[in-house]
Amino acid sequence: MSRTSLEVKAKRKPKFSARAYNRCPICGRPRGYMRKFGICRICFRNMSLRGELPGVRKSSW
């Protein structure tokens, strides 16, 4: 199935709640999803490096 059809399928309410899973709303990626921000790790990295996520900065120690 194409990515867009899988995104539409994921948005529907499943018959059983255990079947529901999160997808990144930007790219549609099902893995590496960060609940706190609601996006995948790759989109999180891109947005944080561009400064689009307030309060997030690159760590340094």
Curated annotation (Swiss-Prot):
One of its GO terms (cellular component) is cytoplasm. Transmembrane segments: none annotated. Keywords: Metal-binding, Ribonucleoprotein, Ribosomal protein, RNA-binding, rRNA-binding, Zinc. Gene3D superfamilies: 30s Ribosomal Protein S14, Chain N. Zn(2+) binds at C24, C27, C40, C43. Pfam families: Ribosomal_S14. Its cofactor is Zn(2+). InterPro entries: Ribosomal_uS14, Ribosomal_uS14_bact, Ribosomal_uS14_CS, Ribosomal_uS14_sf. One of its GO terms (biological process) is translation. Binds 1 zinc ion per subunit. One of its GO terms (molecular function) is rRNA binding. Part of the 30S ribosomal subunit. Contacts proteins S3 and S10. Belongs to the universal ribosomal protein uS14 family. Zinc-binding uS14 subfamily. PANTHER family: 30S RIBOSOMAL PROTEIN S14 (PTHR19836), SMALL RIBOSOMAL SUBUNIT PROTEIN US14M (PTHR19836:SF19). Binds 16S rRNA, required for the assembly of 30S particles and may also be responsible for determining the conformation of the 16S rRNA at the A site. HAMAP family: Ribosomal_uS14_2_B. This is Small ribosomal subunit protein uS14. It comes from Oleidesulfovibrio alaskensis (strain ATCC BAA-1058 / DSM 17464 / G20) (Desulfovibrio alaskensis).
